[in-house]
Amino acid sequence: MPREKVKRGRRATEKANKEASKRKRDDAPEDVVPKRVKPSDDETNDFGAQTGDMPFYGLLDPEEQEYFSRANEVLETNQFGDAEERRVFVESVYKEAEGKELKISCSQSCSRLMEKLISMSDIHQIRRLFSKFIGHFLHLVQHRFASHCCETLFIHAAPGVSQKPSKKASKTEAEEGDEPEPELSLAEMFMKVIEELEGNWGYLLTERFASHTIRVLLLVLAGEPVDLSLSDSVVASRKKERHGVLNEVQDENPVAQKRSVPESFEGTLKKIMQDMVSVLDDTYLRALATHPVGNPVLQVLVYLELSHFGKASAKDPKSIIRRLIPDDTFEEGTESTVFIRGLLYDPVGSRLLETIVRYMPGKLFKGLYKNFLRDQLRSLSRNITAGYVVLKVLERLGKDDLENAVELLVPQIPNLIERSRVIVPKTLVERCIVRGVDTTPIARSLETAYDSDPAKRLSQMLTLEDTTTTSEPQQQNQAQDQDDHQQPPAIPDFGPDNANANINTNPKGAKLHNSLFVQTILTAPGPLSALVYSSLLSQTPESLLTIAKDPTASHVIQKSLTLPTSTPQFRRQFAVRFTGHLEELALDSSGSRVVDALWHATKDVFFVKERMAQELARSEMALRDSFVGRAVWRNWSMDLYKRRRGEWAAKAKGLDVGGEGGQKPKSRIELARERFAAKAAESEKKKNGEDA
């Protein structure tokens, strides 16, 4: 008889039991409670604090996504006839988005539309949208896409915090059937946001997305400017995209100005700042200084404490600046010097140190400079990261200390120029001009740093030669630079430090910095600017054309023709070098600006300007066929030159005072109206006198 296959049967039985149990689990009813979403890296902060479950607000339908995508394209092009047409379109998008605001804000494809929509909204639309977000801010500020919408909302709501809601407007909208105005004012809405975020400041400091919004919120409460496009903004990096109307004038931009805020904001701001740092001990607070996410928030806290609450706050032992820098003697080996030394060479921490140096009280800064930074100024200026701290130090020095700093840094200038690090020499020249310090030692140092031949000197200063490859001596200098200072032992090999090194060795970046350095030199009177002026006069016509058509280097020629340090003798000799090449320059995007500068440079040499106008008139057809050529034709008033030569000559000689001052000259009919109005006012005054 064949043997019973027990093994196979046992395995088959076990398999059948497993499948049966699996079917039972599949047939079991689902839980009423929704499943927890697995937390991603974005839902926990860098210190591991759990931020809770992110609510799901739903998805947009395909038709809705298509509509909002088209609306985004319309707002992106911004080709509206007038402001009223844009307002009507924005209002129609708001009506379509009613009830879907949270979905749009959390949508990867449509959150950018919400940002543009907010930036083009009036204060009533912002208040209505703000009221829809209330109750959800704790989750929205931590969302990858919605956090940007919250940030934009805070920025554009800031100018209206001092306004009260209009009951008349609310009643009118109710009669017209529009969405009614919310009862809360913007100031009260901001207080609601504070209530929602209360108790969570500790981990929001280092939350990847919320930290940006928290920084904006702090500045709104303080009444400080919240414009992200400002070069010295502490809110966001300069890469941050700016939405809104492109032709908005900076002076008319309310987010770029300081604002008056309700009195309750100041007390709330103090409490928030205390709550943020009270849960951290001193060691943990100093660790934030080198934290990539926490550092920018700490910068804002230090900035507000030192600039908004006055110098007295720096004396409080519980203040942030005192907890970071407890000793004001800055003796070697103290907590303060150890902390500052660690920040100097750290690519993240040095940003905080720049803010501290810029806003710390004068007495505290003098102690820091004289007891710690002054002796290290040379080695700090050679370092890529610490060099930016040196810039802030130079900006705060008085005349006597600046003269001493010039003596310390002048021997380092040739070494810095060889390594294409001209930011320190550039700032040194700027501060010498402001403080009235003699720049002759800097001029002598530059003479040794560059070639003695004036023609070659300018080529070296503007890096017009091929700099696509880094020479072996430069690589040796860069390697040697790492040993020029005592760095802390733990310096990461990633992040902004490497980025700074790449910028430093980037030929385009070096060329831009060198051009700015030469332009700064031109603003200094005396032998320093004479180095550049003599080099310009030594150039051949071919090299001048090359410089004039270079997008970066051409600014040097423009400045040399228009700055106050440019003498009439130099302009008379230099301007004639471009005759015979005006058509070529006028048809070039960079060269056309040089031709525009020649108009102002030849105001005291009329015969040169007239000869240039004749040359441009001979090239009329070519100039009119070119966009930049038409701009040159207009800026030189060539139509006036062809039709009314006498008026053009008066304008060319600077006799047209109204046009020279930047104001449009009044026409004859306007002058006649003014005379008529003056006579009418005089007769009215006489009549009133007779009646009396």
Swiss-Prot record:
<comment type="similarity">
    <text>Belongs to the NOP9 family.</text>
</comment>
<keyword id="KW-0690">Ribosome biogenesis</keyword>
<comment type="function">
    <text>RNA-binding nucleolar protein required for pre-rRNA processing. Involved in production of 18S rRNA and assembly of small ribosomal subunit.</text>
</comment>
<feature type="repeat" description="Pumilio 2">
    <location>
        <begin position="132"/>
        <end position="168"/>
    </location>
</feature>
<feature type="compositionally biased region" description="Basic and acidic residues">
    <location>
        <begin position="11"/>
        <end position="41"/>
    </location>
</feature>
<dbReference type="GO" id="GO:0030688">
    <property type="term" value="C:preribosome, small subunit precursor"/>
</dbReference>
<dbReference type="InterPro" id="IPR001313">
    <property type="entry name" value="Pumilio_RNA-bd_rpt"/>
</dbReference>
<dbReference type="GO" id="GO:0005730">
    <property type="term" value="C:nucleolus"/>
</dbReference>
<feature type="repeat" description="Pumilio 5">
    <location>
        <begin position="371"/>
        <end position="407"/>
    </location>
</feature>
<dbReference type="InterPro" id="IPR016024">
    <property type="entry name" value="ARM-type_fold"/>
</dbReference>
<feature type="repeat" description="Pumilio 1">
    <location>
        <begin position="96"/>
        <end position="131"/>
    </location>
</feature>
<dbReference type="GO" id="GO:0003723">
    <property type="term" value="F:RNA binding"/>
</dbReference>
<dbReference type="GO" id="GO:0030686">
    <property type="term" value="C:90S preribosome"/>
</dbReference>
<dbReference type="Pfam" id="PF22493">
    <property type="entry name" value="PUF_NOP9"/>
</dbReference>
<dbReference type="InterPro" id="IPR040000">
    <property type="entry name" value="NOP9"/>
</dbReference>
<dbReference type="GO" id="GO:0000056">
    <property type="term" value="P:ribosomal small subunit export from nucleus"/>
</dbReference>
<dbReference type="GO" id="GO:0000447">
    <property type="term" value="P:endonucleolytic cleavage in ITS1 to separate SSU-rRNA from 5.8S rRNA and LSU-rRNA from tricistronic rRNA transcript (SSU-rRNA, 5.8S rRNA, LSU-rRNA)"/>
</dbReference>
<dbReference type="GO" id="GO:0000472">
    <property type="term" value="P:endonucleolytic cleavage to generate mature 5'-end of SSU-rRNA from (SSU-rRNA, 5.8S rRNA, LSU-rRNA)"/>
</dbReference>
<feature type="repeat" description="Pumilio 7">
    <location>
        <begin position="577"/>
        <end position="614"/>
    </location>
</feature>
<feature type="region of interest" description="Disordered">
    <location>
        <begin position="163"/>
        <end position="182"/>
    </location>
</feature>
<feature type="region of interest" description="Disordered">
    <location>
        <begin position="1"/>
        <end position="53"/>
    </location>
</feature>
<feature type="region of interest" description="Disordered">
    <location>
        <begin position="466"/>
        <end position="507"/>
    </location>
</feature>
<feature type="compositionally biased region" description="Basic residues">
    <location>
        <begin position="1"/>
        <end position="10"/>
    </location>
</feature>
<keyword id="KW-0698">rRNA processing</keyword>
<dbReference type="GO" id="GO:0000480">
    <property type="term" value="P:endonucleolytic cleavage in 5'-ETS of tricistronic rRNA transcript (SSU-rRNA, 5.8S rRNA, LSU-rRNA)"/>
</dbReference>
<protein>
    <recommendedName>
        <fullName>Nucleolar protein 9</fullName>
    </recommendedName>
</protein>
<keyword id="KW-0677">Repeat</keyword>
<feature type="repeat" description="Pumilio 3">
    <location>
        <begin position="196"/>
        <end position="231"/>
    </location>
</feature>
<feature type="repeat" description="Pumilio 6">
    <location>
        <begin position="535"/>
        <end position="575"/>
    </location>
</feature>
<dbReference type="InterPro" id="IPR011989">
    <property type="entry name" value="ARM-like"/>
</dbReference>
<feature type="repeat" description="Pumilio 4">
    <location>
        <begin position="335"/>
        <end position="370"/>
    </location>
</feature>
<keyword id="KW-0539">Nucleus</keyword>
